[in-house]
Regions:
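Juxta-kinase regulatory segment immediately upstream of eukaryotic protein kinase catalytic domains
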Residues: 1-39
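ATP-binding pocket architecture of kinase catalytic cores
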Residues: 37-233, 237-242, 268, 272
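Alpha-solenoid helical-repeat scaffolds
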Residues: 7, 11, 38-42, 91-99, ...
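Conserved beta-strand->loop/alpha-helix structural units within folded catalytic cores of enzymes
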Residues: 127, 148, 169-184, 276-288, ...
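Active-site acidic catalytic loop and adjacent metal/ATP-binding pocket
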Residues: 44-52, 180, 256-310
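Conserved protein kinase catalytic core
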Residues: 89, 132, 153, 285, ...
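Helix-rich C-terminal or lid/interface subdomains of diverse kinases
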Residues: 167, 229-233, 302-307, 311-318, ...
Length: 430
């Protein structure tokens, strides 16, 4: 049997977990995987291990002196989670990835405490940054030791819950999102991008986990950097070939050189920003089936600072809150904030989707969440995002997707995308 990429390194990762424990004078009674499947063919973003300790970890092991960490409770900790950050994960920038993850969790914990909410973000006890980006050398993986939270995966239960229970959970989610949006950004962390720690342990601006490059001062610069990132990717694509055919690449460069993005975003508040979770979905939440209460908000691996609209473009797909993946009727209601009248002739599944999206919209309003209908220039931002999507569409830029098509189909998809790209450029005078 051929082992996939994750199985091949399993024993090496297990050895790293043992070494991490030894470095903290701890010994495992049992080590098991979390959210792991041997059938999954692609590299995991992270490898999670549940560690049951032979003796409780005390403050001597976890003193809470490292930036962003919490001291072990006086009665100790018997079970911990160790997360190994996989530098081979697709599209990940490892520069200050672990630091960003830890710092964001620390800020959200503070914000939730300030809001008087239950502490749903697990405490972090220790961490280590990635030292190299060699995917084979597991000893150099960055890692985080954190508190284990109990509960079942919300995504496995949410669709089967009664509407009343869904509404209760959606309100809890809205309160959490409000706390994330209202995180007080430290004085040194006010740029668009990620966060990290400086030499004195203070949280400052840093690189974002899904974008290589230094943080920037405005949203226009942020969106340009995203476009540049797409262009770098397509330059390496054997199918797209940097859009050089028919001189499309030259037209794209003219658009960028003429401050095209800035002109499109002229009605946008280019300095409006807050913390973005980046993957705020039910599969990153745990809840108690009996009380219907959330017990954990997880996975801040993709978090960054940007315009609040970004959250609604990369999260909330499973509760009717994403403006890029919903049906047209729900999308229009999200953008307007008006769910008064459902569209006619909906099938049963669509009715349920509408009801959940409406309940989520109601919860956001009740909890004071900044939503798309409250944000200036949404249409202009989405227009620029359309360009970004055309520059490197998933079915042309992803190696695994390309393997599913023959040369003729690839050429057809490329030609279709090129035509749409030219149409977009012509609409904007290029």
């Amino acid at each position: 049997m051929v082992l996939n990429v994750s199985q091949r390194g399993f024993q090496r990762r297990l050895a790293v977990v043992e070494q991490i424990l030894q470095s903290h004078d701890l010994r495992a009674l049992n080590i098991s995987t979390l959210a792991y499947s041997e059938e999954y063919l692609y590299p995991f973003n992270n490898y999670l291990f549940k560690v049951e300790l032979a003796t409780p970890a005390l403050s001597s092991s976890f003193p809470g002196t490292q930036p962003g960490t919490t001291q072990a409770p006086s009665d100790g900790i018997s079970v911990i989670v160790i997360k190994l950050s996989n530098p081979a994960a697709t599209g990940i920038n490892n520069t200050n990835r672990v630091e960003n993850d830890v710092a964001v969790q620390y800020l959200v914990r503070q914000s939730m405490a300030h809001a008087g909410l239950p502490q749903l973000v697990p405490a972090v006890y220790a961490w280590m940054p990635t030292t190299i980006t060699n995917a084979v050398n597991e000893k150099s993986f960055g890692w985080i030791i954190s508190e284990l939270r109990t509960g079942v995966d919300l995504d496995s239960e949410f669709s089967s819950l009664k509407m009343q229970d869904k509404e209760q959970i959606l309100e809890q989610m809205a309160n959490v999102l409000k706390a994330i949006q209202t995180v007080e950004l430290p004085e040194g962390a006010t740029k668009f991008g990620g966060v990290t720690f400086d030499s004195k342990g203070r949280i400052v601006s840093g690189q974002a986990p899904l974008r290589a490059g230094e943080p920037v001062k405005s949203y226009a610069e942020w969106r340009v950097s995203k476009l540049r990132g797409q262009l770098q990717e397509v330059a390496q694509s054997p199918v797209i070939q940097g859009w050089k055919h028919n001189g499309v690449d030259t037209r794209i460069e003219k658009f960028l050189a003429a401050n095209g993005p800035g002109k499109i975003l002229s009605d946008v508040d280019l300095h409006q920003k807050n913390l973005i979770h980046g993957d705020f979905k039910t599969n990153n939440m745990l809840f108690d089936k009996d009380t219907k209460k959330l017990t954990a908000i997880l996975d801040f691996d993709w978090s960054y600072i940007s315009n609040p609209l970004d959250e609604f473009m990369c999260s909330l797909q499973d509760v009717g809150g994403n403006i890029r993946q919903e049906g047209k009727e729900i999308e229009a209601a999200i953008l307007s904030g008006d769910f008064t009248w459902p569209p006619p002739n909906l099938d049963k599944e669509s009715v349920e989707q509408w009801q959940v999206a409406k309940a989520w919209s109601t919860a956001m309003k009740k909890c004071g969440v900044v939503s798309p209908c409250n944000i200036r220039g949404v249409d202009e931002i989405r227009d620029l995002l359309h360009l970004q999507a055309l520059l490197c569409p998933y079915n042309l830029g992803n190696e695994s997707m390309l393997k599913q098509f023959d040369d003729k189909k690839r050429a057809e998809m490329r030609a279709k995308t090129e035509a749409e790209l030219i149409q977009w450029l012509e609409k904007h005078g290029f």
